[in-house]
Regions:
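Phosphate-backbone recognition surface of nucleic-acid-processing proteins
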Residues: 222-225, 231-317, 321, 356-357
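Short alpha-helix plus adjacent loop in nuclease-associated cores
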Residues: 32-73, 133, 137, 269-277
Length: 357
């Protein structure tokens, strides 16, 4: 490639792309980040859907870069954001594995303890896991009194397990009409194995969350000042956005997230529709954040009065709930962009009353 004009090289954002981007930037080249959805669309337009090879992918990326040079974000392979993304990805994998294990535990408990939902709402909490570990089936509870069980569970539950809870456990187990199943010892071993895996993943999750919180503080981010945004949500957003300097304005960030509406028009008439392009992980995170912000508390008060008022305003204009949430997502993008760009904290605007203009 010649070093003409702005010296632009094209790359995929995953796999070996980061190492290549680092090398090219060190050489003084401008590197653009091409989303896989954009290169896939380019491949469809040139009729190459059924010719899948490395050379076809490279051509699609090159054409996408040439056609959308000014719209694509600059690649910024910052080590801090890259490491943050690795941690977020690891946490997501742990949560997926944990969900799979919880479902497997449900299958075992349905047979061993038919009434288990009466005494443990969340079967994967530390107290519940301790119980399944020491009492994988009802036969291990023989001879156990309420006092004995409470003395055992109180330290594990940090004094939250009451005598009433222990009575509920023993009464529910006694009322179950369950006959002695053959080969219960084999199923008990399965339960113990699942519990051990859950405890292992919980330990890993704790360590990952600690590191994520440390990195969040190290980056000096202020996103947690937004109501409804905790550290985990904030680091998910940061991991996908990376260095905010690669986006010249909020519109570029909205396009990157796939939240900017796509305008379709013909014969002077047109409409805005939701785009299927962009960073899906960032798009989903922002969308679910918008859902949390418009929700009402148990007392009926809005969690974020400003966002709720904007949501009701859009609904009154004839927009559907989904369209209103997309509008909120777009506003959140602008807020997040400004906070990351200037390092400012979120300030709750004042909701104007109906009589105010």
């Amino acid at each position: 490639l010649s070093s003409a004009a702005s010296d632009v090289y094209k790359r995929q954002a995953y796999g070996y792309g980061r190492a290549l981007a680092v090398w090219l930037i060190d050489k003084g080249y401008l590197v653009k980040d091409v989303n896989t959805a954009i290169s896939h669309r380019q491949a469809k337009h040139r009729g190459a859907m059924y010719r899948k090879s490395d050379s076809d992918d490279a051509e699609a990326i090159a054409l996408a870069t040439l056609n959308m040079l000014d719209k694509l974000p600059d690649a910024c392979p910052n080590d801090a954001y890259w490491s943050l993304g690795q941690l977020v990805h690891r946490r997501d994998n742990i949560m997926k594995q944990r969900t799979r294990l919880v479902n497997q535990l449900h299958e075992q408990l349905c047979i061993a303890y038919p009434s288990y939902k009466q005494f443990f709402n969340d079967i994967s909490r530390p107290t519940a896991l301790y119980f399944w570990e020491h009492y994988p089936s009802r036969k291990y509870l023989k001879g156990k009194s309420v006092e004995d069980l409470r003395a055992e569970l109180v330290p594990v539950s940090h004094n939250k397990c009451s005598t009433k809870t222990c009575e509920k456990i023993l009464d529910a187990v006694a009322s179950d009409k369950v006959k002695n199943n053959a080969y219960q010892d084999a199923r008990d071993m399965v339960t113990l194995s699942i519990v051990s895996d859950l405890q292992h993943y919980d330990s890993q999750l704790t360590e990952v969350d600690k590191m994520l919180e440390q990195m969040y503080k190290m980056l000096g981010c202020t996103l947690t000042t937004i109501p409804g945004v905790n550290v985990i949500t904030a680091v998910k957003i940061l991991a996908e956005i990376g260095d905010i300097k690669r986006f010249s304005n909020a519109n570029k960030l909205a396009q990157f997230a796939g939240i900017a509406p796509l305008h379709l028009s013909s014969s002077g008439k047109g409409k805005d529709v939701a785009t299927k392009q962009g960073n899906r992980r960032l798009q989903v995170t922002i969308y679910f954040l918008a859902i949390q912000m418009v929700q009402l508390s148990s007392k009926g008060t809005p969690r974020n009065p400003v966002v709720r008022a904007y949501y009701e305003k859009r609904k009154a204009e004839g927009k559907t709930s989904q369209q209103a949430l997309i509008c909120i997502s777009r506003r959140l993008i602008s807020i997040i962009y400004g906070m990351l760009k200037h390092g400012t904290e979120y300030r709750m605007p004042v909701v104007e009353s109906a009589g105010e203009k």
